[in-house]
Curated annotation (Swiss-Prot):
Entry protein name: Holo-[acyl-carrier-protein] synthase
GO CC annotations on file: cytoplasm
Similarity-based family: Belongs to the P-Pant transferase superfamily. AcpS family.
Positions contributing to Mg(2+) binding: D8, E57
Coarse class of the protein's main subcellular location: cytoplasm
Required co-factors: Mg(2+)
Record flagged with keyword Amino-acid biosynthesis: no
Gene: acpS
């Protein structure tokens, strides 16, 4: 069953200006070290950060909170599987909120899709509850 859906659109040019103006202070407040390392290795640094910003916004909406109620930017982190598929990793209050939304006997799965077409970066997040597999008899 679907527990939450969120989407967000971020302007890459605005992200580039924000990075230039606030630099490390902004990066350290919003992005995890893993996200920063990924972005700084990319040719399109601002685009990579903008997609991750949009993913955090979309995830907070899917959690039903937006960026309030104690949720921190770094409680939501975008990583990539070896295949390149993006995944959301939740910690802190975001993980607590996810656990509180998940019905008994289910596990939560957070799906994320990222895309960009300059000057826009977009993220879409779906939180799904799947029934837990019954233990073998």
């Amino acid at each position: 069953m679907i527990l939450g859906i969120g989407t967000d659109l971020a302007n890459i040019d605005r992200m580039e200006k924000t990075l230039a103006r606030f630099g490390e202070r902004f990066r350290n407040r919003v992005f995890t070290p893993l996200e920063q390392a990924k972005a700084e290795r990319r040719a399109d640094v601002a685009g990579t950060y903008a997609k991750r910003w949009a993913a955090k916004e979309a995830c907070s909406k899917a959690l039903g909170t937006g960026l309030r109620m104690g949720i921190a930017w770094k409680d939501m982190s975008v990583a990539n599987l070896e295949t390149g598929q993006p995944v959301m990793r939740l910690t802190g209050w975001a993980a607590e909120r996810l656990a509180s939304m998940t019905p008994p006997g289910h596990e939560a799965v957070v799906h994320v899709s990222l895309t960009d077409d300059h000057p826009w970066a977009q993220a879409f997040v779906v939180i799904e509850a799947r029934p837990r597999a019954a233990p073998p008899a």
